[in-house]
């Protein structure tokens, strides 16, 4: 009973922005999708020329009233084998897709479907970011949703027994679209 009252009080304070929450986020997706660039932009508010991620990296970020421990796990085939090691106690997954590389949409869908089928992640909210919308050959949100099989996401609704999933289109280099995704995600943490 005491914990219920404390939890209710904490939720009220958090809704008013008076309680700091903490979450663990994983940045996943295929190589060259923009995971490291996004994390660098969130941390340093500037672009940089970055090398592919060969080893997992961790950063502490504050977005709004939430402090995140983030893990950039790399997207090359060897790195994907390590993803499962970071699933315990994860609060959210940010899955990036290069929206200007439709040749790799099938590969991204296979990885995303595999993640959706992991029991340990059944309640973990997923943000799918269609990155690089500034590129001339980037697909639309509807095309990306179709290619990834994400036609019925939860949007802003909380649906009992259904994992929160939403797609946002963004351009990390143009600083566009990703903050909305983190605002959406923060309501579930």
From Swiss-Prot:
PROSITE patterns: SAR1 (PS51422). It catalyses: GTP + H2O = GDP + phosphate + H(+). InterPro entries: P-loop_NTPase (IPR027417), Small_GTP-bd (IPR005225), Small_GTPase_ARF/SAR (IPR006689), Small_GTPase_SAR1 (IPR006687). Keywords: Cytoplasmic vesicle, Endoplasmic reticulum, ER-Golgi transport, Golgi apparatus, GTP-binding, Hydrolase, Membrane, Nucleotide-binding, Protein transport, Transport. Its EC number is 3.6.5.-. GO terms for biological process: endoplasmic reticulum membrane organization; endoplasmic reticulum to Golgi vesicle-mediated transport; intracellular protein transport; mitochondrial fission; mitochondrial membrane organization; nuclear envelope organization; positive regulation of ER to Golgi vesicle-mediated transport; positive regulation of protein exit from endoplasmic reticulum. Belongs to the small GTPase superfamily. SAR1 family. NCBIfam families: small_GTP (TIGR00231). COPII is composed of at least 5 proteins: the SEC23/24 complex, the SEC13/31 complex and SAR1. This is Small COPII coat GTPase SAR1. The gene is SAR1.
